[in-house]
Amino acid sequence: MPEPVKVLVTGAAGQIAYSLLYGIAKGDVFGKDQPLILVLLDITPMMTVLEGVVMELQDCALPLLKEVIATDKEDVAFKDLDVAILVGSMPRREGMERKDLLKANVKIFKSQGAALNKYSKKSVKVIVVGNPANTNCLTAMKSAPSIPKENFSCLTRLDHNRAKGQIALKLNVASDDVKNVIIWGNHSSTQYPDASHATVNLQGKDVGAFEAVKNDDWLKGEFITTVQQRGAAVIKARKLSSAMSAAKAICDHVRDIWFGTPDGQFVSMGVISDGNSYGIPEDLMYSFPLTIKNKTWKIVEGLPINDFSREKMDLTAKELHEEKETALEFLSCE
């Protein structure tokens, strides 16, 4: 059996983690023969709840799970990590300005970035889920200068999966028959879900999504807004934010980093924009279409971008730039 992989999940007493931990521990992410050490971090007031989560993990009697470490201390949590999944963040409270939310989260992710820098392996893969995910990821990256920038990514896979699901529902096909949708930009309502490079398998033949759907107005209108606003729609219906679907997306995201993407397919992740060929400013955590091989991602180059896409890609880049400026302001006065 290989050496155990050491995986941290923060916000471990929360509802996304509750759906996520079982998936990781039973081998959905790192494979069915990869032993694991799970490290669970949360804030001190949540430690009693976290004890209950640990009990349940023990009660699952999972063969791959070699050890569970629950802690409220960053120096314990970040020690010698292979993978860090940063789910915990300050949630937006009613009446809270986005700026206040950014400020609270800069503090958290600056501290966690510094802990990654100090205690984790330099090869650690860091996945940021807690919102605002792109800017939180940028903050952590900037606070961990000894870890390669490429090791940081943030979750837009939930949006990616939502986009696949909407096209599949529209055409009454399996979501697996829809490939190469793209989420560009920020994990916010300015994100751009782009179907113009997607294909759909109809009767055994791959057809462009626009040709398959035969409704350009829908793909350029309702499809985009549905994906952009899906998180809010789930909250409205369930009175809780997406947890099961978020956990599934995290599993997909991390599994693809670990094992790579299938040939001819790409996925969406927020990564550092340096050196991209799409005219997106450098030094932003921006969601691009990626292929992954040997645990290394590469932006898919050379996709033709029409005026409709250009405008939407630039709009979400502008929002990310503004978030970054605000975060850097807070970072420098922390």
Swiss-Prot record:
A Pfam cross-reference name: Ldh_1_N
Top EC group: oxidoreductase
Any one GO cellular component localisation term in the record: cytosol
Disulfide bonds: none
EC number: 1.1.1.37
Active site: H187 (proton acceptor)
Localization: Cytoplasm, Cytosol
Subunit structure: Homodimer.
Protein role: Catalyzes the reduction of aromatic alpha-keto acids in the presence of NADH. Plays essential roles in the malate-aspartate shuttle and the tricarboxylic acid cycle, important in mitochondrial NADH supply for oxidative phosphorylation. Catalyzes the reduction of 2-oxoglutarate to 2-hydroxyglutarate, leading to elevated reactive oxygen species (ROS).
Protein name: Malate dehydrogenase, cytoplasmic
Gene for this chain: mdh1
